[in-house]
Curated annotation (Swiss-Prot):
Its EC number is 2.7.11.33, 2.7.4.28. One of its GO terms (molecular function) is phosphotransferase activity, phosphate group as acceptor. It is an enzyme of class 2 (transferase). Belongs to the pyruvate, phosphate/water dikinase regulatory protein family. PSRP subfamily. Keywords: Kinase, Nucleotide-binding, Serine/threonine-protein kinase, Transferase. NCBIfam families: PRK05339.1. It holds the Pfam family Kinase-PPPase. It catalyses: [pyruvate, water dikinase] + ADP = [pyruvate, water dikinase]-phosphate + AMP + H(+); [pyruvate, water dikinase]-phosphate + phosphate + H(+) = [pyruvate, water dikinase] + diphosphate. This is Putative phosphoenolpyruvate synthase regulatory protein. Disulfide bonds: none annotated. The keyword Nucleotide-binding applies. Bifunctional serine/threonine kinase and phosphorylase involved in the regulation of the phosphoenolpyruvate synthase (PEPS) by catalyzing its phosphorylation/dephosphorylation. ADP binds at residues 152-159.
């Protein structure tokens, strides 16, 4: 079955998209065509949105699923005239919260993502800059300021994981690629020894690593299965020898990898 899904907001659309994606992921037998539509903040835009939804309904033969975080009642009423199944995220969850807290919500657009109301904005930017500045072992003299240091073979997912933790949680994460020389010595490089308590290892299935490296350097020793299998085996031996906690990243999303790392290392998120 194929269905269309719209994530509609009068702000960035981040909330509607994040929650909507999580809910749709529970239906593995349905194929969704997904459309994010931020800043639907006027009745004119809402009417144009209704046309898009109705076209999708006619094309699919099923009414689209609509996740919205629209604040303006007039705009919501226009969207409700479409041939779509609407899930109003704010009204669904805010009403019972208001009852439980005996407090009316501000119901304001972009509340959780606006710079003016988010004291964590600068921490997020600083964490991202830290991840970029300390990527791929480029610098090691700032490791004393790191919350975490990810280690592993080249192209096993260290960089995207560091950036995700920086963006989402303000975690200052560096990453260091272990080289063939490190593997042969079966000991940590000098730059990492003083920070062993911050280390977390990522490993990966050799066949998956081969596929990833072939996209970057096809038909090279670097991307050969034999080389990938050797590096993964030796790095896992090093992790066990040095008692470094680690996980296999092959079958996990960056979100899942990040959550597992934070739990395993007991690192507190700077913001949630």
């Amino acid at each position: 079955m194929k269905r269309s899904a719209f994530f509609i907001s009068d702000g960035t659309g981040i909330t509607a998209e994040t929650l909507g994606q999580s809910l749709l992921a529970q239906f593995e037998n349905v194929t969704f065509s997904k459309f994010t539509r931020p800043y639907i903040d006027s009745m004119e835009k809402a009417r144009a949105m209704v046309q898009q939804i109705n076209i999708a309904a006619e094309k699919d033969g099923h009414r689209p699923i609509i996740f919205d975080t629209i604040v303006n009642q007039d705009i919501r009423e226009i969207l409700a005239t479409s041939n779509g199944f609407m899930i109003d995220i704010f009204s669904t969850f805010l009403a019972p919260l208001e009852q439980e807290l005996s407090e009316h919500s501000s119901y304001s657009v972009g509340k959780s993502h606006s710079i003016g109301h988010n004291s964590n904005y600068m921490e997020r930017i600083e964490a991202v800059n830290f991840a970029l500045d300390n990527d791929d072992g480029a610098r090691t003299h700032y490791y004393d300021k790191a919350d975490l240091i990810l280690v592993g073979v080249s192209r096993c997912g260290k960089t995207p994981t560091c950036l995700y933790m920086a963006m989402q949680f303000g975690i200052r994460a560096a990453n260091y690629p272990l080289t063939e020389e490190d593997m042969e010595r079966l000991q940590l490089p000098n730059a990492l020894r003083a920070h062993k308590h911050k280390l977390f290892g990522l490993t990966i299935d050799p066949d998956r690593l081969t596929a990833i490296r072939n996209e970057r350097k096809p038909n090279s020793r670097y991307s050969s299965y034999a080389q990938c299998e050797f590096e993964v085996r030796e790095v896992e031996n090093l992790f066990r020898r040095e008692n470094i906690p680690h996980i296999n990243s092959t079958h996990f999303s960056v979100e899942e990898i990040s959550a597992k790392i934070l739990v395993e290392k007991g690192v507190e998120r700077r913001f949630k």
